[in-house]
Amino acid sequence: MRLFLFILLTSFYLQAQTHFRINQVGYLQNENKVAVAFSKVPLTQKVYLVDAQTDKTVLTPKIKAVTNGNWGTFDYYYELDFSKIQKIGNYYLKSGDDKSTIFPIGTKLYAGIPDLLLRFMRQQRCGYNPELDVYCHQKDGYSFYGPMKDTTFVDVSGGWHDAGDQLKYLITSSYATAHMLKTYELYPNKFEDKVDALGKPGANGIPDILDEAKWGLDWLLKVHPDPKSLVHQIADDRDHAGYKMPDNDNSDYGWGANSYRPAYFATGEPQGLGKFMSSATGVSNLAGRCAAAFALGAKLWKYDAEFAARCAEAAKTVYALGKEKPGYQQGNSVKAPYRYNESTWYDDMEWGAAELYRLTGDKSYLDDAKEFALKSNTEDSWTVKDTTDHYRLYPFLNFGHFVLHELVDKDFQKKLESYYEEGIRYTLNRANRNPFKVGVPFLWCSNNFLSSLAGQLILFEKMTGSKKYNEYLLLQRDWLLGRNPWGTSMYSGIPENGEFPREVHTSLYALKKLEVPGGLVDGPVYASIYNNLIGIHLLHPDEFAEFQNNHVVYHDDLGDYSTNEPTMDGTAGSLLMMAHFL
């Protein structure tokens, strides 16, 4: 009888338990502060905001029941608004015996976070890796589809490993480089100088974000060795040969382990060295983003006349290549049908043309940018879609509309603003159908969509001066930092003592248990995607099992590359958002 009562009471407690979800990094003093609570039974007790130092209640937040859908096995959701509290300190939410984790309210809560994101970027470096202090992939690579004979050596060492694997893609590296440069241009006083150009400790008089962006620019210059050539990918999925350290790469492309890797030249035509062929119609997606990066590099390195001139010339020639071969080039695969399926390019050429006009004053670039903007409008954006293939609508933030905005008349400005706002409203409509008010579809790399949506909201505010979507922006940021069903940040090591991805899908963790902070993991995916991917096998019982539902899953597990693999471009693509809140 006692055992029966114990089980009954335990079951009741678990049913009645209230879970709190907050931004673990914390809340800035003057911003809206809205947490989520959920339970399997109605919340009948009051909720208190408690000062963590004194354990005294400072506010009884009004409890607002959320009726716009539930999430998984929990039926009752509530919003807890404590925006009126602005006193700096550490706090927690409490209802009965249930408490949230402690979180701060303050002024400089995001200081240091960009440094962590840049540290993750440094550990993704190829050629020389300062995190590991090793040299790797010095034999990149042997040419394919180039103007020379196949398997001719071309020096394309450097750049970044793309994710947990060790491939290098111009698709993602061009965006990461340009995003960092644009972020610095918008927030020039927000970045520290703690490392040198090689990523080793010690200031060198250059903000670390520019050191990292130049690492990207140097590689972009290598893969555009002459006006008619552009290398778009180094290695392929033959890299996926188990966990390995970058300086001891056992993948074999036909020349032995730890040796040469293929360097694919962009031709604007389908490619593939196996049975899986990519789709391609041109090279404009790559050329446009590279042109934007080079033009920004030429402006930001004015003090280095030789380097600035190289960037300026490269911007012009690669942009011309994009006009000569209009269309898109996708990634290549050999072993499996998984690749970057990008098939948009008007947005990239718009951005490249707009930056070239800013650099040169040549009106032909402005005319091009306006033409591409009208063609891109919202057609190139995931924000007005419910589903799409992996990376088909890349990049996930169209900087082109923002850059062009200051260069055109008011009527054209209104068009550009409307393109951004149409996407924002579409995602907001989706957000209003779930209790966390998250606005993205849970496709592969949903976290990249989220950081990009935050970026679009920030740029819209800069374009228009309107803060009408500011609360929505905060909720997207907060999701990435813990205000989600699993209560976890989506960045490794952030915040330091919080719940964050630990068992990330990388060789560094698998072989060395090395936890490098700052990496944005892929994030939650639809169960329909997760269940149909090849090679996923959880290594441990699911710690978040209670919070999964039948539609969307996330696992902090080394074996889940679909949700817990950190990506280079997603991490770089978060810097705009993080800089905004510094």
PLM regions with names:
Residues 209-234:
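Carboxylate/His-rich catalytic cores and anion/metal-binding grooves
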Residues 374-379:
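Solenoid-like repeat scaffolds
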Residues 17-25:
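Short, compositionally biased P/S/T/A/G/V-rich stretches that sit at domain boundaries
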Residues 24-101, 107, 122-178, 183, ...:
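Aromatic (Trp/Tyr) and acidic
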Residues 319-320, 327:
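Hydrophobic, small-residue-rich alpha-helical packing segments that form membrane-like cores
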Residues 331-342, 383-391, 435-444, 493:
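Acidic, Ser/Thr-rich low-complexity linear motifs
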Residues 1-17:
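Bacterial Sec-dependent N-terminal signal peptides
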Residues 198-209:
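Acidic, glycine-anchored loop motifs typical of Ca2+
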